[in-house]
Swiss-Prot record:
Record keywords: Ribonucleoprotein, Ribosomal protein
SMART domains in alphabetical order: Ribosomal_S6e
Record HAMAP family: Ribosomal_eS6 (MF_00512)
Protein name per Swiss-Prot or TrEMBL: Small ribosomal subunit protein eS6
One Pfam family recorded for the sequence: Ribosomal_S6e
GO biological process, any: translation
Coiled coil: none
UniProt keyword Ribonucleoprotein, yes or no: yes
Record's GO cellular component terms: ribonucleoprotein complex; ribosome
Recorded family membership: Belongs to the eukaryotic ribosomal protein eS6 family.
Length: 148
């Protein structure tokens, strides 16, 4: 019985929301890889996405906190000599470090899945994740400022 935290980012609004994904919906994520796209209507019980929208898997992390790496095949854990992203940001150029990383495939040991909404081409409607109250107030203030 896998349970995931799905962090869904919306490029249109610049916002992200976190959802708790449990069975049977969580079973649909098992076996997917980084870069795979899922139909947005699968998540209709969590969030209302526009018709034709897709959800693209961009990464995640395991139960021990190790990030998923797109270059490691399968649902495995490996120690990798990392010198750049993803999963390691060296403080100095050229530095390398041995890091624990997960493979690119989602399994039941993954805790968090990162994903982004991919809108259909030519979509001009409202964003799937709306702006909050603070952002709306900021927009109103910026609209009022030039009118003075």
């Amino acid at each position: 019985m896998p349970t995931f935290k799905l962090v869904l980012s919306d490029p249109m609004s610049g916002k992200a929301r976190q959802f708790e994904v449990k069975d049977p919906l969580a079973q649909r994520f098992i076996g997917l890889k980084i870069g795979d796209e899922l139909d947005g209507q699968v998540l209709k019980e969590l969030i209302e996405l526009p018709k034709g929208a897709k959800v693209k898997i961009t990464g995640g992390s395991g139960i021990e906190g190790a990030p998923m790496h797109p270059g490691i095949p399968g649902p495995v854990k490996r120690y990798v000599l990392a010198d750049s992203r993803p999963g390691y940001h060296p403080p100095k150029r050229g530095m390398k470090k041995k890091k624990l990383m997960r493979g690119n495939t989602i399994s039941d040991t993954i805790v968090q899945i990162n994903a982004v909404v991919v809108y259909p081409e030519g979509y001009a409607g409202p964003p799937a994740i709306p702006l909050g109250a603070k952002e709306l107030q900021k927009e109103k203030k910026t609209e009022e400022a030039p009118a003075q």
